[in-house]
């Protein structure tokens, strides 16, 4: 399992920036791989203020193509080249992503020094990134968009005594773990022959811009961290929903029903100078609710439970 599993909030506002509150961008670091969820205007500058190296960004996931979620791409992609990047970059998003990213690239009038791979993700399909998997589902916004889940791979705990009892060599256990099976002395061994149980991986769900929708309950079920659209407060719920957003109360209701461990409110309307109104509203429903703040880092702890098999 990964040694580092860390969220850094680079921008937490919605639509219009404010001093100290930039546009949506979230870095999720899994060991030395940085995954960027959305890239609002000024994201590259936010990286420079943070403790996260933008040169380690390997994957970018765009939730939808409203400007506040991707206008930071031209600058960031340009700066990669200015800094001599040669490593491949992957950009993922909903249907239409390929055309939108081509438009972004047309704004850059010098040579890109690295290869950019663009992919339109399919709903509910598992995308394998070695240490973790990423899933996407369509949410409920005014523009076609995705919610994302990044889930660390489960760790199969090996029982060395079981291996000894069936005559499987200890120096081949990692090969068995990595491949799921291994042939030794003409006999096929399965990882389950020596497994003691499963340590579940950590998981983060990012809603993107969305009204509340039922599929989120299953998608976010039991996740460690839910980062959810909380654009407005409950007194203007109809307005929030009309514009394809959620209130802090609605985000908390989803967190409660989905049995998540922690909720971070996100994508605040610029009408709010004091965010405690949103926080208190959420906490009245789901106590483990927190405000996302720029440069806030949150390390997701490894799970200690072992699911016996």
From Swiss-Prot:
Q: What positions does the entry give for Zn(2+) 2 binding?
A: 68-69, 209, 267
Q: Taxonomic lineage of this organism?
A: Archaea, Methanobacteriati, Thermoplasmatota, Thermoplasmata, Thermoplasmatales
Against HAMAP family, the record matches this protein to: RNase_Z_BN
Q: Which gene produces this protein?
A: rnz
What function does the entry list?
Answer: Zinc phosphodiesterase, which displays some tRNA 3'-processing endonuclease activity. Probably involved in tRNA maturation, by removing a 3'-trailer from precursor tRNA.
Q: List the disulfide bonds.
A: none
Family per similarity comment: Belongs to the RNase Z family.
The active site is formed by 68 (proton acceptor)
Q: Describe how the cofactor binds.
A: Binds 2 Zn(2+) ions.
Decide whether keyword tRNA processing is in the record. Answer: yes
User: Which Gene3D superfamilies does the entry mention?
Assistant: Ribonuclease Z/Hydroxyacylglutathione hydrolase-like
Keyword annotations for this protein?
Endonuclease, Hydrolase, Metal-binding, Nuclease, tRNA processing, Zinc
Q: Which domain of life is it from?
A: Archaea
What InterPro entries would the database entry show? Answer: Metallo-B-lactamas, RibonucZ/Hydroxyglut_hydro, RNase_Z/BN
Recorded hits in SUPFAM superfamilies, A to Z, give: Metallo-hydrolase/oxidoreductase (SSF56281)
The enzyme class is hydrolase
Binding-site residues for Zn(2+) 1, renumbered to this chain? 64, 66, 141, 209
Assembly state and interactors?
A: Homodimer.
Enzyme Commission no:
3.1.26.11
Q: Name the CDD domains for this protein.
A: RNaseZ_ZiPD-like_MBL-fold
Instruction: Show the catalytic activity.
Output: Endonucleolytic cleavage of RNA, removing extra 3' nucleotides from tRNA precursor, generating 3' termini of tRNAs. A 3'-hydroxy group is left at the tRNA terminus and a 5'-phosphoryl group is left at the trailer molecule
Is-annotated flag, keyword tRNA processing? yes
- GO molecular function terms listed in the Swiss-Prot or TrEMBL record: 3'-tRNA processing endoribonuclease activity; zinc ion binding
Q: Which cofactor does it need?
A: Zn(2+)
Q: What is this protein called?
A: Ribonuclease Z
């Amino acid at each position: 399992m990964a040694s580092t599993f860390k969220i850094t909030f680079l921008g937490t506002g919605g639509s219009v920036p404010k001093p100290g509150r930039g546009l949506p961008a979230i870095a999720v670091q899994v060991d030395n791989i940085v995954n960027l969820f959305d890239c609002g205007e000024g994201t590259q500058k936010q990286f420079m203020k943070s403790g996260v190296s933008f040169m380690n960004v390997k994957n970018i996931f765009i939730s939808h193509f409203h400007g506040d979620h991707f206008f930071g791409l031209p600058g960031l992609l340009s700066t990669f080249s200015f800094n001599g990047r040669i490593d491949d970059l992957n950009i993922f998003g909903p249907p239409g992503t390929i055309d939108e990213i081509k438009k972004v690239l047309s704004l850059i009038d010098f040579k890109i020094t690295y290869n950019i791979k663009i992919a339109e993700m399919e709903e509910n399909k598992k995308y394998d990134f070695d240490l973790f998997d990423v899933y996407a589902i369509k949410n409920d916004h005014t523009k076609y968009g995705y919610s994302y889940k990044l889930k660390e791979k489960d760790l199969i705990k090996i029982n060395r005594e079981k291996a000894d009892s069936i005559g499987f060599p200890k120096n081949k256990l990692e090969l068995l773990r990595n491949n799921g099976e291994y042939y030794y002395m003409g006999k096929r061994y399965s990882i389950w022959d020596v497994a003691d149980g499963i340590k579940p991986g950590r998981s983060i769900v990012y809603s993107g811009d969305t009204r509340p929708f039922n599929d989120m309950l299953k998608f976010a079920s039991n996740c460690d961290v839910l980062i959810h659209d909380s654009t407005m407060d409950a007194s203007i719920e109809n307005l929030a929903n009309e514009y394809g957003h959620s209130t802090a109360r609605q985000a908390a209701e989803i967190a409660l029903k989905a049995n998540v461990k922690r909720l971070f409110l996100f994508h605040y309307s610029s009408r709010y100078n004091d965010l405690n109104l949103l926080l208190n509203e959420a906490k009245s429903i789901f106590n483990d609710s927190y405000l996302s703040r720029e440069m806030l880092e949150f390390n997701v702890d490894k799970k200690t439970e072992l699911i016996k098999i």
